[in-house]
Amino acid sequence: LKRALWRKKQRREAEPSNTLDDLLARVDFRDAEPVVIEMATQRHVADTLYEAKMECVGQDKDAYLYYILLRYPGRTLVFVNAIDGVRRLVPLLTLLGIPAYPLHGQLQQQQRLKNLDRFRRAPHAALLATDVAARGIDIQGVDHVVHFQVPRSADTYVHRAGRTARAGREGVSIALIEPSELRLWRAIWQALERQDTVPTMPVEYTFLTPIRDR
């Protein structure tokens, strides 16, 4: 992971960039002193973030998530597109021995704060969250982000991935992609105007097979 992060940083430093001042210098304004309001959305992730993907069939996603949580211990923020998914995964992971806590809009505020506190205090745990519930909440100490489903937009992807690799720390973002989501995934990457490709996370299949059986 460290070698991959170093190569990513080298590519980012070598890429030319157009600043707002450069673009404004090319525009012929009628007003000598135009008022400029910048409304661009931040679509860059941290240089210390390692991004990867895992392609699998939909019925194997649970097993792949469990594999990630066992293979890469730490605090993992798992984004799910719907509340029903959170409600299904939390008891499943708990049954498998993974401390798992829900975060979604139908929880009382007190329960959300309690789950966040439990997640922060645990050295190894999973926080299952919807995008709406996670917005505006400062979740510190996240080691990994898992996109259990491909996000619906490029901005959502950046927002999710930005929950790790903060303040100079290293972090990992892994997208679980089933065949029906490949088109959306490619559209997100195109919208981000990223030239690099996302590497496929290596999977130890000898380790994954018994997980499927569970």
What function would you assign to each model-found segment?
Residues Y50, Y66-L70, V90, T94, ...:
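Amphipathic alpha-helical interaction motifs in eukaryotic regulatory proteins
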Residues T48-K53, R118, I211-R214:
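Short, surface-exposed amphipathic charged segments that create phosphate/polyanion-binding patches used
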Residues W6-D21, L70-P73, L95, S153-A154, ...:
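Arginine-glycine-biased low-complexity disordered regions
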Residues L1-L107, M201-Y205:
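Interdomain coupling/hinge region of P-loop NTPase helicase/AAA+ cores
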Residues Y64, Q111-N115, A133:
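Short acidic active-site motifs
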Residues G97-P99, H104-Q109, R121-A125, T130-L184:
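Conserved RecA-like helicase motor core of SF1/SF2 enzymes
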Residues K2-R3, A46-D47, R87-R88, Q110-R112, ...:
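Switch/connector loops and helix/strand junctions flanking conserved nucleotide-binding motifs
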